[in-house]
From Swiss-Prot:
Residues 18-96 form the GIY-YIG domain. It comes from the Bacteria. Pfam families: GIY-YIG, HHH_5, UVR, UvrC_RNaseH, UvrC_RNaseH_dom. It is found in: Cytoplasm. It comes from Acinetobacter baumannii (strain AYE). Belongs to the UvrC family. The UvrABC repair system catalyzes the recognition and processing of DNA lesions. UvrC both incises the 5' and 3' sides of the lesion. The N-terminal half is responsible for the 3' incision and the C-terminal half is responsible for the 5' incision. This is UvrABC system protein C. InterPro entries: GIY-YIG_endonuc, GIY-YIG_endonuc_sf, GIY-YIG_UvrC_Cho, Hlx-hairpin-Hlx_DNA-bd_motif, RuvA_2-like, UVR_dom, UVR_dom_sf, UvrABC_protein_C. GO terms for cellular component: cytoplasm; excinuclease repair complex. Residues 207-242 form the UVR domain.
């Protein structure tokens, strides 16, 4: 612990209760560093300050603690719920176990009548009315399923605003992925049947679908409707192809299977999802964990995952190690999601197969991550030797714009586990002279560190000038930050970078230096993040700025134009006659728009 805070901390530890509750670790300025729960507050909190702690993350946390606050609860379940609420509210830096905490992807069937749409999105949108299917472990797997649904059942996936404006079928109809309900080329009854079949497919009811398609194909052939028979035959072939690729189990029901593994400082949790007897896939997580007991670590991960990331919990959670607080976690999940949840570590038959599959995947994933982890640790170690101080967290800023247009500042965050994408931030720069990178960097740094905690190393891309400006910002904010400026070498070639320090010294690392490789990795990621966000902002601005120059064309009609033609490129390609079709434009405005866009 910090030596200045030792007397105060020791006094707190001596007076701690042995009741269950929640504890909060606070930093020098009173900022919340970490929230934890405990069955026995005295034992748990005191364990952070024993000399045998070896985990670097725990050591870094303890070194920053200046104060501790506790809240006593009536039970461990209550402590768990309170802990997760505090984490969700404050997002303490040492509680963030998941580097990328995006919600899972779900496939959604809307309740729009008479022509529902099928789409995908992250999380269960509470503003949406309809049916959700999932979770899918990645956007790719959800898109793959949507593509199959398009080919099988031709259900629309377009936005309602686009759908309502159509006057003729779009490209999806031409390539046989939509039945064009927008222009009435399919009856509501036939479309409803396609939607219901899509839902049955998503629910895993493919056996009956198979039989129905066979019956329809045979009936069409008997009626000498050979085109229709070929249509059903093609659908049947595609359905069987999809079935062959899916892992389908005889046991119905829903379950998440979680397997944890730990090796050489790397923790991996593999989650597999089974819904309606179908394996939807899985995802590997590499959380930052404080602890050395696998059961407790998995329990902490599950609390974090199901309370902070997941939109739902299945009725059954199968784990590869017993949890010390299984009952408390079951009760907390039941309260949170309003359903009974069972956590099982001893299973047989099909469930044992699921668990074996998850364990096989977690071992495979941790081996792949381990080599990356060891290389990254070595890079951090060499950088620590170069700068002469311990480094756990690095933040790097970059500015991106096109001739001063749509400036964006990015901030990326790395620690010894790699990129912390959930900590990334972007800043839309405003009210500066176009192209003034110094002013842009000043604004970004000021906005970031007015509230956020300083990292162990702040990398400034831009060299000596930007570094001096950053020093001024820190002085104005009353902060002491360890900063290094990075300037590119002659010809801006990688490997010739120079590091500038706040005391005026500078060094140039050899091209094969692992410390240099880490700096390049962080800087390049900051550049990638900045330029990606800048291009999106620039393109969005350009798509509307051309239309904004047209007199008499207000925001609503600009929006209608873009919606009708699918974007600015569609508007530019449209003829004068096609422009008149847009509701509310009329011939005069259509002629004006066409003339201005094509002068």
């Amino acid at each position: 612990m910090n030596q200045n805070a030792r007397p105060h901390i020791e006094k707190i530890l001596a007076n701690l209760t042995q009741l269950p509750g929640v504890y909060k670790m606070l930093g020098k300025e009173g900022e919340l560093l970490y929230v934890g729960k405990a069955k026995n507050l005295k034992n748990r909190v005191s364990s952070y300050f024993v000399k045998t702690i070896e985990h670097p993350k725990t050591q870094a946390l303890v070194a920053r603690i200046y104060d501790i606050e506790t809240l006593v609860t009536r039970s461990e379940t209550e402590a768990l719920l309170l802990e997760q609420n505090l984490i969700k509210q404050h997002r303490p830096p040492y509680n963030i176990m998941l580097r990328d905490d995006k919600s899972y992807v779900y496939i959604f069937v809307s309740a729009d009548k008479p022509y529902p749409r099928i789409a995908s999105g992250r999380g269960k949108g509470k503003h949406q009315i309809g049916k959700f299917f999932g979770p899918y472990p990645s956007a790719y797997s959800a898109r793959d399923t949507l593509l199959v649904l398009q080919k099988l059942f031709n259900v629309r996936q377009c936005e309602n605003s686009y759908f309502s404006q159509r006057k003729r079928p779009c490209l999806q109809y031409q390539i046989k992925r939509c039945s064009a309900p927008c222009v009435g080329l399919v009856s509501p009854e036939d479309y409803k049947e396609d939607v219901n079949n899509s839902i049955r497919f998503l629910q895993g009811d493919t056996k009956e679908l198979n039989q129905e398609l066979i019956a329809k194909m045979e009936q069409a052939a008997a009626d000498l409707e050979f085109e229709k028979a070929v249509f059903y035959r093609d659908r049947l072939s595609l359905l069987r192809e999809v079935q062959a690729q899916q892992a389908v189990f005889k046991v119905k029901g829903e379950a998440d299977i979680l397997a944890i593994a730990y090796q050489a400082g790397v923790t991996c949790v593999q989650i597999m999802h089974v819904r309606n007897g179908r394996m939807l896939g899985g995802k590997s997580y590499f959380p930052d964990m404080l602890g050395d007991d696998l059961g407790q670590m998995l329990s902490d991960f599950m609390a974090n995952f199901y309370f902070q990331v997941a939109d739902e919990v299945p009725s059954e959670l199968i784990v590869n190690t017993a949890l010390p607080d299984r009952k408390e976690l079951e009760e907390a999940l039941a309260q949170q999601f309003g359903k009974k949840v069972q956590i099982k570590s001893s299973v047989r038959e099909t469930r044992a197969e699921w668990l074996e599959l998850a364990e096989m995947n977690v071992q495979h994933a941790i081996k792949g991550q381990l080599s990356n982890h060891l290389e990254l640790n070595e890079r951090f170690h060499q950088l620590e030797q170069v700068v002469g101080r311990p480094i756990d967290r690095i933040e790097c800023f970059d500015i991106s714009h096109t001739m001063g247009e749509a400036p964006i500042a990015s901030c990326v965050v790395f620690d010894q586990g790699g990129a912390r994408k959930r900590d990334y931030r972007q800043f839309a720069i405003q009210d500066i002279t176009a192209g003034d990178d110094y002013a842009a960097m000043r604004q970004a740094l000021t906005r970031r560190y007015k509230k956020a905690m300083l990292p162990d190393l702040l990398l400034i891309d831009g060299g000596k000038g930007q570094l001096h400006m950053a020093m001024e910002v820190m002085q104005e904010l009353g902060l002491e930050a360890f900063m290094v400026g990075v300037s590119k070498g002659e010809g801006r070639k990688p490997g010739l970078e120079t590091l500038h320090f706040t005391d005026g010294t500078k060094i140039q690392l050899p091209e094969d230096s692992k410390a240099l490789h880490l700096i390049q990795q962080v800087r390049d990621e900051a550049h990638r993040f900045a330029i990606t966000k800048h291009r999106a902002k620039r393109d969005k601005r350009r798509s509307t700025s051309v239309l904004e120059a047209i007199p008499g064309l207000g925001p609503k009609r600009r929006r209608d134009l873009l919606t009708h033609f699918g974007g600015i490129q569609g508007v530019l390609k449209a003829s004068e006659k096609e422009l008149t079709v847009v509701p509310g434009l009329g011939e005069v405005m259509a002629r004006t728009i066409y003339k201005i866009l094509h002068e």
